[in-house]
Amino acid sequence: MCGSYYGNYYGDHGYGCCGYEGLGYGYGSLRCGYSSCCGYGHGYGSRFFCGCGYGCGSGYYY
């Protein structure tokens, strides 16, 4: 589960930071972890879109 420290408040699109191999590193619209994408989820107006549960573990931008 992506963003495991804070849970997936938006279902598949976890609130917070999606780190390498799906670990959670902090929260908010900041980049953190190794090759990660953070934000409020895919399509929530965040600068960094992260499809938690789809490609977040690899740090893909959507």
From Swiss-Prot:
Q: Which InterPro entries does the record cross-reference, listed alphabetically?
A: KAP6 (IPR040313)
- Superkingdom classification of source: Eukaryota
**Which cellular component terms (GO) are annotated to the entry?**
cytosol; intermediate filament
Q: Family per UniProt?
A: Belongs to the KRTAP type 6 family.
Its biological function?
Answer: In the hair cortex, hair keratin intermediate filaments are embedded in an interfilamentous matrix, consisting of hair keratin-associated proteins (KRTAP), which are essential for the formation of a rigid and resistant hair shaft through their extensive disulfide bond cross-linking with abundant cysteine residues of hair keratins. The matrix proteins include the high-sulfur and high-glycine-tyrosine keratins.
The GO biological-process annotations, alphabetized, read as:
keratinization
State the name under which the record lists this protein: Keratin-associated protein 6-2
Taxonomic path: Eukaryota, Metazoa, Chordata, Craniata, Vertebrata
PANTHER family with a match to the protein in the record: KERATIN-ASSOCIATED PROTEIN 6-2, KERATIN-ASSOCIATED PROTEIN 6-3
User: Assembly and partners?
Assistant: Interacts with hair keratins.
Which keywords describe this protein according to UniProt? Keratin, Repeat
